[in-house]
């Protein structure tokens, strides 16, 4: 359940919710890091749930030694009231036997909070694309029926491509198609739940490979900004996203020179 950091429970009615899927390369989580850090979003609450692997650490967005010791947990909510934006950062994998419970928790919170729309940032294995997905941009989107009428035209104007369905029996028959997001974690199931429960959701994902996924995170967050205009885009160049201090340890500490 959601627990507020303050005495009063914040109102999210009419807000846009952005959350990542724990997927290949952790691209969605890295993109959310950039968003929280750049907008300097304060934490307004966290989730107390047994669906995620427990974790605790220092404040990943600390700007000084004073707030560096602030405790961070596996799922925290940040907010920007002027932009009517809420961000849920998930820092731990979902326990395999609790995936369905986690999806129910998310759907229930989305409905009770009155979010205007939810945006799920995700990724999928690039090596498992089919022929039609090899051409053009690696970015894809999906819209739930309740959001499709409002946003489809806008996405087409941006030149975005909808996630293609692929054949259930490739090379044999194309009559039966399915949505396939390899490496996408909870993406497909949560999107399907939102379609069934009439929850407005957009999924924005990128095909990538495991490794240094920082460029993928920048590509994904720039794509999101083109749609939502969270930060003003300069006439020349791209938006200057602020990398959080925690990224210094993204690949661990350096090689000790004494080894040589």
Swiss-Prot record:
<dbReference type="GO" id="GO:0043248">
    <property type="term" value="P:proteasome assembly"/>
</dbReference>
<keyword id="KW-0143">Chaperone</keyword>
<dbReference type="GO" id="GO:0005634">
    <property type="term" value="C:nucleus"/>
</dbReference>
<dbReference type="InterPro" id="IPR016562">
    <property type="entry name" value="Proteasome_assmbl_chp_2_euk"/>
</dbReference>
<dbReference type="GO" id="GO:0051131">
    <property type="term" value="P:chaperone-mediated protein complex assembly"/>
</dbReference>
<dbReference type="InterPro" id="IPR038389">
    <property type="entry name" value="PSMG2_sf"/>
</dbReference>
<keyword id="KW-0539">Nucleus</keyword>
<dbReference type="InterPro" id="IPR019151">
    <property type="entry name" value="Proteasome_assmbl_chaperone_2"/>
</dbReference>
<comment type="similarity">
    <text>Belongs to the PSMG2 family.</text>
</comment>
<dbReference type="Pfam" id="PF09754">
    <property type="entry name" value="PAC2"/>
</dbReference>
<protein>
    <recommendedName>
        <fullName>Proteasome assembly chaperone 2</fullName>
    </recommendedName>
</protein>
<comment type="subunit">
    <text>Forms a heterodimer with psmg1.</text>
</comment>
<comment type="function">
    <text>Chaperone protein which promotes assembly of the 20S proteasome as part of a heterodimer with psmg1.</text>
</comment>
<dbReference type="GO" id="GO:0005829">
    <property type="term" value="C:cytosol"/>
</dbReference>
């Amino acid at each position: 359940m959601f627990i507020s950091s303050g005495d009063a429970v914040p109102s999210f009615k009419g807000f846009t919710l952005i959350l990542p899927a724990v997927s290949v390369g952790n691209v969605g989580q890295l993109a959310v890091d950039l968003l929280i850090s750049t907008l300097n979003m304060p934490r307004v609450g966290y989730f107390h749930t047994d669906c995620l692997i427990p974790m605790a650490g220092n404040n990943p967005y600390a700007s000084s030694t004073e707030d560096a010791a602030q405790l961070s947990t596996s799922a925290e909510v940040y907010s920007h009231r002027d932009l009517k934006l809420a961000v849920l950062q998930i820092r731990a994998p979902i326990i395999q036997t609790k995936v369905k419970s986690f999806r129910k928790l998310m759907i229930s919170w989305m409905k009770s909070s009155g979010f205007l729309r939810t945006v799920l940032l995700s990724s999928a294995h690039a090596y498992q694309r089919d022929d039609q997905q090899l051409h053009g941009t690696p970015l894809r989107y999906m819209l739930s029926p309740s959001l499709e009428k409002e946003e489809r035209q806008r996405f087409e104007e941006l030149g975005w491509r909808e996630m293609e369905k692929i054949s259930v029996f490739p090379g044999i028959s194309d009559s039966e198609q399915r949505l396939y997001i390899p490496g996408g974690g909870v993406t497909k199931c949560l999107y399907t739940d939102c379609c069934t429960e009439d929850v407005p959701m957009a999924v924005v994902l990128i095909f990538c490979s495991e490794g240094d996924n920082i460029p993928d995170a920048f590509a994904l967050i720039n794509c999101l900004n083109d749609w939502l205009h969270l930060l003003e885009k300069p006439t020349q160049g791209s938006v200057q996203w602020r990398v959080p201090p925690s990224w210094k340890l993204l690949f661990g500490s350096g090689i000790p020179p004494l080894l040589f």
